[in-house]
Amino acid sequence: MGLSPNALSQYDTNSDPDCWWSATRCTSPKKSKLSHDIVTCPEPSTWGLTFDDGPNCSHNAFYDFLKEKKIRASLFYIGLNVKNWPLQAQRGLADGHDICVHTWSHHYMTTLSDEQVFAELYYTMRIIKDVVGVTPQCWRPPFGDVDNRVRAIADGLGLRTIIWSDDTNDWNIKPSGELPKSKIDRNYEDIINKGKDGSGVVVLSHEIRADTMNEFMEMYPKIQQAYKHVVPLT
């Protein structure tokens, strides 16, 4: 289920009452009881390393690379994937990565009822706890689609909302996607160049396919040169 164009066009973006990211990129709720979303790294020259959409059965070489380079990341796992590939999920924790929630089935969360939002988060937390042995404290909404209603439900489950400052768009690389590899390379290069002025960034990347994982492995030497720290977020 996608976002309704009518809902987006009719939303009051000036007052932005719901802090709806999909409409306004809002990450700082006006409601005092809700924490702001994590979007950037406050530490200078820091690459906040995050990967969405895992785990799956093709990750061994990628996880081997991260382990060899002593790289730790925040991994946003889909609940159904954890159910289908439990050994890969267990390795994520064993290798020292932070395990976070990316919902059960990767829907636009603001299109769901309260009960559906709760289920997407709760059952993902539960399968991670049952399979991996930890209770996640962080989550990322698929497509970044979150508003105050969804944030409040996540907050009630003890989950901090994490978005991103920079998007590699690696998920859209050809042949599965629409963008040539050269465009994804440029996206990475643009983020890498930010490190030269001491920026702290949270980068959206994916472990969804071999080509997205290969892209990070190829770019890592440049990332390491430009940023003093390449770290998970929690």
Predicted regions and their residues:
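Catalytic domains of cell-wall/extracellular-matrix polysaccharide-remodeling enzymes
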Residues: 83, 107-229, 234
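Active-site beta->alpha N-cap acidic-glycine motif
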Residues: 1-108, 116, 120, 125-137
